[in-house]
Curated annotation (Swiss-Prot):
It holds the Pfam family RBD. It is found in: Cytoplasm; Cell membrane; Apical cell membrane. One of its GO terms (cellular component) is apical plasma membrane. This is Regulator of G-protein signaling loco. Residues 11-36, 1312-1325 have a biased composition (Low complexity). InterPro entries: GoLoco_motif, PDZ, PDZ_sf, PH-like_dom_sf, PTB/PI_dom, RBD_dom, RGS, RGS10/12/14-like. Disulfide bonds: none annotated. Residues 1354-1376 form the GoLoco domain. Disruption phenotype: Homozygous mutant flies show dorsal-ventral defects in egg (shorter egg length and fused appendages) and embryo patterning. Fail to hatch and show severe glial cell differentiation defects: disruption of intimate glial-glial cell contact and absence of glial cell processes enwrapping neuronal cell bodies and axones, resulting in loss of the blood-brain barrier (BBB) formation. Heterozygous flies show an enhanced stress resistance, fat content and extended lifespan. It comes from the Eukaryota. The keyword Repeat applies. Residues 827-943 form the RGS domain.
Amino acid sequence: MHHHHPPLPITGASGSTAVGTGAAAAEDASPAANSGPAPISTSTTPSGSNSQQHQRRRKKRANYNYNGIRTVEVRRGYNGFGFTISGQQPCRLSCIISSSPAEQAGLRSGDFLISVNGLNVSKLPHETVVQLIGNSFGSIRMQIAENYYSDSSDEENAHATLRGQLLAASLRHKPRFLHHKAKLHRLRNSPQKKLNPPEAVEPHKSKSSPDHPTLKPVLEDPPLTANLSKAADVANVSAMVRAVGSAALECRVIVGYLGTIEMPKQISHSSKLQTVRSCIRKLRQEKRQPTIVLMCITPDSLSLQSSSGGVLATYSSARLNFVSSSSESENRFFGLVTSAVHNTQIEEEYEPSAGSAAAAGHISISHSCHVFVIDTKLIEHAQHLQRAHEFRLQCTRDPISNLCLEFPNNSEYVVNLVRSMYTMRILPPASRSHQADYEAGAGAAAAGGAVAAAHSPQPSNHSEISTTTSNSDSGIGFNNDCTNISDRILVVDFLAAGAGAAAAAHAGPPTYPAPARPLGIVGIPDNRLTVRAMPDHSALLRSPPASSSLRRPNLLASFNLIQSPATNLTSTRSCDDVLNLFVDDSPRTLAAVASMDDISLHSAAPSLDEGHTFAHPACVPRKMRRSLALETPTTPHKLSAQVFGQPGSRHSLGFEAIDSVQSSVSGACMDQTMDTWASLQNLHKSHKDRTSMSASSSSHCLLEATNSEPDLGNRALPANASPFRRAWGQSSFRTPRSDKVAKEQQQLGQSSPVRRTASMNASDNDMYIKTLMLDSDLKSSRSQHQLSLLQVPKVLTTPAPPSAITASVAAEGAAQDHGCPSSWAGSFERMLQDAAGMQTFSEFLKKEFSAENIYFWTACERYRLLESEADRVAQAREIFAKHLANNSSDPVNVDSQARSLTEEKLADAAPDIFAPAQKQIFSLMKFDSYQRFIRSDLYKSCVEAEQKNQPLPYSGLDLDELLKTNFHLGAFSKLKKSASNAEDRRRKSLLPWHRKTRSKSRDRTEIMADMQHALMPAPPVPQNAPLTSASLKLVCGQNSLSDLHSSRSSLSSFDAGTATGGQGASTESVYSLCRVILTDGATTIVQTRPGETVGELVERLLEKRNLVYPYYDIVFQGSTKSIDVQQPSQILAGKEVVIERRVAFKLDLPDPKVISVKSKPKKQLHEVIRPILSKYNYKMEQVQVIMRDTQVPIDLNQPVTMADGQRLRIVMVNSDFQVGGGSSMPPKQSKPMKPLPQGHLDELTNKVFNELLASKADAAASEKSRPVDLCSMKSNEAPSETSSLFERMRRQQRDGGNIPASKLPKLKKKSTSSSQQSEEAATTQAVADPKKPIIAKLKAGVKLQVTERVAEHQDELLEGLKRAQLARLEDQRGTEINFDLPDFLKNKENLSAAVSKLRKVRASLSPVSKVPATPTEIPQPAPRLSITRSQQPVSPMKVDQEPETDLPAATQDQTEFAKAPPPLPPKPKVLPIKPSNWGVAQPTGNYCNKYSPSKQVPTSPKEASKPGTFASKIPLDLGRKSLEEAGSRCAYLDEPSSSFV
């Protein structure tokens, strides 16, 4: 009999069909989804064999069904053959591209590759097959097996019996990614083939009523006898397995746990080493902090324990698959591979055939790689002594290396331990150890017990979530492959081992072996940590009374199976809402427990006579509320919002929040009590806490809705954020409860203790503030529950044992934590808070002759809390004289700056005058003295005394008065943890679901208090009043601009104690921090650095995050004004700033003006361009916007983002003129310019001459006005080919205000800068050196555009001509300042000649109709305004007239549009000689000047050799080519001029 087990295709594109021996393939294969496995129908042979599909099989020897082998020939296409292969030995076709040669040849996803071109590849590695196919050209001939079978093996023979007794049923594989709703819908609605059972096999009778669902097989292939309840069968099978607890040998080592990564289903033995090392490499790249655990290696199992003795994970020896270190060079890391059995059949609806009571299931084995690291810092005995005490280890010396065996120095020792312990005997398959469990549990299945459903929360492979990180247990994104069972390691302190053992003792006879899963991951077989805790009331109702003599364990729970009738709505859940249904043969407590990634747990109260309960840890105290009824466990709000919709008036409380509410139980089916766990990270209570809480665990709790979907309606989230980013990309920020329960709670005068635990899966700086809603009656409950002031335990941030962590939680310094030396190692601040610790530490300092430090620090603490100013003055002088003065009696070691700062402020007696010195001393003690103290014999003696319950050497009762401080909340919050050496001494965020929860260099307590004061000035909260929701709203409402909640504030976790009080708190720490909100809503706390600009700070942040923002603005939160990026970053200290993306593009105006435009990305193009056109007096109707490069018109209704980084041009639709580089308008569209009447010109010229004589004396007399008005405006900010005539006009109009802005001529200046230069910018070069000859500064060509519009405004033209003549007079005067006019200027005929020349030039510049002009014979020292293209070669001062294509690339791009004719030749005789270094001006910004000194060609050796100090004269080339193309009319005054900015 052949049994066919084709593996499930990974990404099949078409449905594949199982082939049975002698039977036709089934015709109704379920259609496959586009991206998922193709469901495979089952066909039954006439002989009655059923085809079970197995996703993965152990492969032994290749054996093929030769009826299913075919030979195909595939030709290589343009893009290859069109198929992908996966796996190896043999490889499998995993994806067939549609319309590819592979599809045309008939290849199907799931087929196995047997041979290629006659070469058998069934046993070759994957890489070899890939190379063989990839190197083939033309066509390849392949042998394809439609099914792949293993040879008969022991494993298969053992399963044969079971197969013969299981009837065939129409079963389908469940989809691997249930969150594809369309695919799920198709799958659920696809037709199913009903098969009649073969007559040869007698139906197995069900022991349950027909109403109860039947059971699918659980294990891979355990043998099943007809009588399932025989104790002898159980004993026989269990005898094959080693009994748990029979180990006599045990090895224990301390290791660090990094994380778990799911491994491929099909992993061959040869690739295990490579796979393990890749897992190690991935986790190392994520730079995770290890969790220190105790690995106990026994012959039966390998377990991981926490420092409190709680079992974190247990793996039976049968499940340990492989162990290896990372490499020989880096031997600190090692990986442990475990296997787990699971059933791939999710609760699909099905109809039992007549007489059939069981259906074939789909069994598969998955592997998990757990990565560990050896802490080499703990090798020395003195270094790990404290850690050994935490784990209650007695160190065992190695006589050879003289090192402790419990703290190995490399991973090879642990690897060899594991190998030697488990490889000396032949281990059975992973499923073999569970046959007894199955035989015992099958009866329960036949009795109709509901099956426990559990799936591991895998990190999602969704494109918006997945990054380059591994798929290890990151605690985010539960929506992916349900079939992967991950052996997650849960770092939680459970109840003491005694209670757990007592609870487990009732799970079944001691002969029962451990199940395949880790014992519920916590040592109890019947519990599974599921993704969403959701009990099913139908499970309780279906549960029959106990009928079996055996108290059997709920095996199905540990095997993670799902089964429910077709009518159960829960079968349509997404993967992250899988239910956990616990039912046994008697009504049991519902013990639905969420997965460790979920953090919100829902468990039954512990009872030692029940086997289905977790031991209840200590939990956060809650107010009793008897008025509420427990909701029915199957209320839809506990399920996915995708299926049931968002519940009304409820907010999504995902795995970051717990709303713990206690109520009485009123449900008819709920006869057991329920309770709610606190967050898994926060169950760090001492044993006495757990005991006291267990006693009161009969109180009833109601778990708030735990929808896994992101709360997209939350106002705190940006509307444009991706749902995945908003839900999981950053730490979710949920809103507090707003349902009736919360309202009623407020009416009762209580506030729900909502814990918001941000999952720190983003970068270390991505931190969110937790909203802490605190109990108003906290003080009364403090002594009862022995909890901290704010009942929020710290996330595991210290390496201390749970007792120390418990102590570290008590922010107010409760009495039970005093005199506890083990807590001192966890925190320097905690030790100072403890009177015994203070006294012990001071005695230690006295032995080191540095006790003055602690005395100074405590004196400063007392001083800071003084109310009276007079007392402060006296106390300040006393402290200064004793510790800081030059002749002080007990001087402390502070730097001179802190000492001088204190001395300067001594008279003021401000509360914080000693803050700098105190901070230095505190850091000195914390990072120097305290470190030695922890390793000192004095501290060890204190710890030993504590462990032996002996009195401490220094009890603190007789503490020196000078060492006493007021450790109330306000004082304690200021115990600095600045610049903590967290990397060496703390484990900050060891598992990914509580990633780093403290700001790197600031204590969370300090930050929250300071942020309260710095960012949200508000009415003071009473000193000792808890921060209730009402007061929190009051605080937040005071300053909405800095609302910590609306802005999704980014401090990850705070000790709640700082929320109240905080009086006298110095804001020094927070003032070196600022919060930066990025465009995607992510927030970060960034430290400002002295000497760093705002721009550098933002660039540093963006670079760290690997973000590229080409253009952005930085604005204060709530403001619209952008911050200058050149300002020092200190202006951001204590502030909240937002980085806003901007769109930037360049805009060419019709006249040669280039504007750089920066806009918000949400605007449309016309909204951006219209104000610009209005500013420059253009109308939208008269212009058209085109792309400068392609000349394609642009639709202005498009978003402005389409122009990002582009170059746009504005062209006149019907213009009289078109000037500018790159003009696309033909010359014929430019009309000839009407020359001005002769009378106007004469009048203007005479007026100019009269006025400039009067202004000359003023200009010379005023030393200030000359550099501003007369000196060259050519500076580093302006290009040389621009005229300053109208810049001066604008300046005068700005100063005098006599010329309206609307009347300024449309003479747009060209600018090649990347950004629009300020028109009012003044020169720096000329002003800085007013003694240079004015002629040198002013000698330059002036471009004057004479248009009809200019002629209309004669006042402006007059002003321009007047300044031109002024410059002309300066030019004629030579390098020496001489106020006598030259004789030739006194000749009136010269002026008439100038006017005549002007007329001639204007006529000659008209390209259409030229007005003839008579040349004059008079000498021409006056302004020569004629230049045409034909005159260019005459110039003796010709400037390197190279074609524009010869320009350097960088220069050409920016100057090609601004080219113009070259300057005029120099004037004869009186012209000052230009020196060789003429025009040495350093361009700034993006301006590139064509005429650099290297390109300057001296006109003559004489001119080149003349000395001079001229710095800002650059000849102009104003767009020769473009001028001709546009037919533009320009007149060039060959006078000195200034360029605009």
